[in-house]
A protein has these predicted regions:
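Hydrophobic faces of well-ordered beta-strands that scaffold small-molecule active sites
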Residues: 5-9, 33-35, 61-65, 108-112, ...
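Acidic (Asp/Glu)-rich catalytic clusters
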Residues: 24-28, 49-62, 101-104
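Catalytic beta/alpha-barrel core
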Residues: 35-40, 119-120, 137-148
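Glycine/small-residue-rich loop that forms an oxyanion/phosphate-binding "nest" at active or ligand-binding sites
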Residues: 70-112
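Active-site rim beta-loop-alpha module in soluble metabolic enzymes
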Residues: 148-163
């Protein structure tokens, strides 16, 4: 049995000239990246540059969607309906996917960020909404989740899962 470790980091978390972390340093050591999709952090220019850098280095690109909460960095409960969660996820996946395709790669996984990432573990309606979005968008995407409702829903639907 061969063991493989996938080192992943959250990247593209900035706005305009402001950057959250040292993405260039992380790009030198990671094999996968969770890329902010514009709702908690990231903007079109940052998403484009991050997708390009990942494609150039052969780093697997993943979506890091969140609640539409820039001020709270995606860490606040927004009181969204399940339909809003589904639609927000589809919107963010589409945005990152466009940049990935522009650089000859594709989105490979999705890892919900912040409060969304916490709530999909305990709220079945949010877990179903995320799974619905993934099935509608690309059911080959690996779901990165904590053990809980989203992981259970991914298993029920036969979606690829990493915990």
């Amino acid at each position: 049995m061969q063991t493989r470790i996938d080192l992943v980091a959250d990247l593209g978390e900035g706005y305009g000239d402001w950057r959250m972390g040292d993405d260039d340093a992380l790009l030198g050591i990671v094999s996968s990246a969770n890329v902010a999709c514009g709702f908690h952090a990231g903007d079109p220019t940052i998403m484009d540059a991050t997708a390009a850098a990942c494609a150039e280095r052969g780093i697997q690109l993943g979506a890091h969607p969140s609640f539409p909460d820039r001020v709270g960095f995606g860490r606040r409960d927004m009181g969204l309906s399940a339909a809003e969660v589904r639609n927000d996820l589809l919107y963010q996946l589409g945005a990152l996917s466009a940049f990935a395709v522009a650089h000859g790669t594709r989105v490979r996984h999705v890892a919900p960020h912040g409060r969304l990432g916490n709530l999909v573990g305990v709220r079945a309606d949010y877990a179903v909404a995320v799974a619905d979005a993934l099935c509608a968008f690309d059911d080959s995407l690996i779901v990165v989740a904590q053990d809980g409702e989203l992981a259970d829903e991914a298993r029920r639907r036969g979606l690829p899962l990493a915990i």
